[in-house]
Amino acid sequence: MISKEKKLELVLKFGGSQKNTGDTRVQIAILTEDIESLKKHFAVNKKDKHSMRGFIAKVNQRKRLLAYLKEKDFNAYKQTI
């Protein structure tokens, strides 16, 4: 999990304002940070199968959001990646 401060930083960077948490780019950024932190967790805890399920769900959610963003606003998609 990422800290509240890190989430706020991502919201301000990708969303523009503190209240713009539902923006697709913000959601993708938060999921990416979560995924990166979970990668470190799985490097140490290889047998944690329960958390792996949640990790895969986050990866799939990010994949769907990226596909949506690519379809709706290609320039924002390129900036996000």
From Swiss-Prot:
One of its GO terms (molecular function) is rRNA binding. SUPFAM superfamilies: S15/NS1 RNA-binding domain. Pfam families: Ribosomal_S15. Disulfide bonds: none annotated. SMART domains: Ribosomal_S15. CDD domains: Ribosomal_S15p_S13e. One of its GO terms (biological process) is translation. Keywords: Ribonucleoprotein, Ribosomal protein, RNA-binding, rRNA-binding. The keyword RNA-binding applies. One of its GO terms (cellular component) is cytosolic small ribosomal subunit. Belongs to the universal ribosomal protein uS15 family. HAMAP family: Ribosomal_uS15_B (MF_01343_B). One of the primary rRNA binding proteins, it binds directly to 16S rRNA where it helps nucleate assembly of the platform of the 30S subunit by binding and bridging several RNA helices of the 16S rRNA. Forms an intersubunit bridge (bridge B4) with the 23S rRNA of the 50S subunit in the ribosome. Part of the 30S ribosomal subunit. Forms a bridge to the 50S subunit in the 70S ribosome, contacting the 23S rRNA. PANTHER family: RIBOSOMAL PROTEIN S15, BACTERIAL AND ORGANELLAR (PTHR23321), SMALL RIBOSOMAL SUBUNIT PROTEIN US15M (PTHR23321:SF26). This is Small ribosomal subunit protein uS15.
